[in-house]
Every structure is written in C-alpha cells, then in structure tokens.
Amino acid sequence: SVAQGHADIGMASREISPNEKIRFEKSDLRTHSVGLDGVACMVSSEVYQAGVRQLTRREIAGIYMGKIRNWKEVGGPDREIVVIDKERHRGTRHVFMQYIFGNALQRTPGTLLVTGSNNEEQAKIAQSDSAIGMLSFAWMNEQVKAVSLQDQGKEFLPTWEAVQQGQYPIVRKLNFITAGEPKRDIKAFIDFVKGPDGQKIVKESGYIPIGGKD
C-alpha cells in the first residue's frame, strides 16, 4: 500500500528485500527502525519439561524438512512432532528461515500446520503437547517455551540480554516504512516513537528500544 501510494506509512518486522527494492524502485521505500526483536524456536511446555531445552540448527532444519519426525530423535519424548510454520510473507518467518536454511523463503515439507500471526501460532503451540514453531521473544510464556540454539559448538540463549549484547543470532529490526521522506505529520509520529516516550512504549510492549538509531 505504501509503495502504491495508498498509505503514508506502513510497518514491517524485517528489512526491505533486494527484489522489493527493484520492484518498487520508483517509490523510494525507506525504513525507520524503532525497536529490536529476537525470534526463537519455540516448543510446547510438555516437550520442554521432557528434556528438549536446546536444538542444533541442523536438528531444526531436519524437523522442518520432515527428516526428523519424533521428539525422541532429539532427546525428547516418544511423540510425533507437530511442526508449525508461518505464512511465507511473514517477517518472523523470514529471519528464522534465513538463519536456519540461508533462504528466507525456504519450503518446509515437514510442516503440519501453517499459521499467520504470532498470536495464532502461540495459541497452537500452547494447545499442543508436541509442537515446534517460531515466535517473537515477546510471545514466550509458561505454555510456550524457547529453546537455546546450538550452532558450530556455541550455545545461544534466547534472552533479551543476549539480543542487546549482540550474542543472539536471530534478531530483526521493527520498522516503519515510508515512500521517500515522510510527510511532516508522519515524520512527527516517527520521531515520537523514536523519542523517550515512544521508546518506553516499545519496551512495555515486550521489545528492545533502539532510540533514534536506524
């Protein structure tokens, strides 16, 4: 809508892709970053309590490709894995799949269920006793647990501190999108969100403030 002139401002939880920059070159799309978010591999609390507290990148890839189908193959209970993916255009999916596969649009034949919003996926994982999915850190709770990532001999803990310190690999910027320089009232709104009061709201919403940084 922004690129087509139907809206003055939009939102995206990922960067504008190279293809989008080419496709909408005349629109001069620009990002205005207002926060940071971590994306974690999440599992049902029953799986977590049964011993699955960490997964390697290769194991996660194997699960989504349908090569690993039972939790017992990765140290968990003897239970079929309910693999939950997101709609392919979702920003959460883009950064997660880019890290796991090196391809933001990777197809995942092991998927049993495709969801849209983080809210929907959180509910599906919580309702199951054997699910895996991908969610923003802001959606972790007692029923939906984040596992740590193992990659090349290193363990990456899914904590806000790790994101802030640059020690967690799946991080994305939360952006406003405008076509060219924003209009005066739109710029005032963006400046507010980047300012102290707006950044307080960002933090209260479960994300990491970044102030005026782009």
Predicted regions and their residues:
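Exported/periplasmic ABC-transporter solute-binding proteins
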Residues: S1-D214
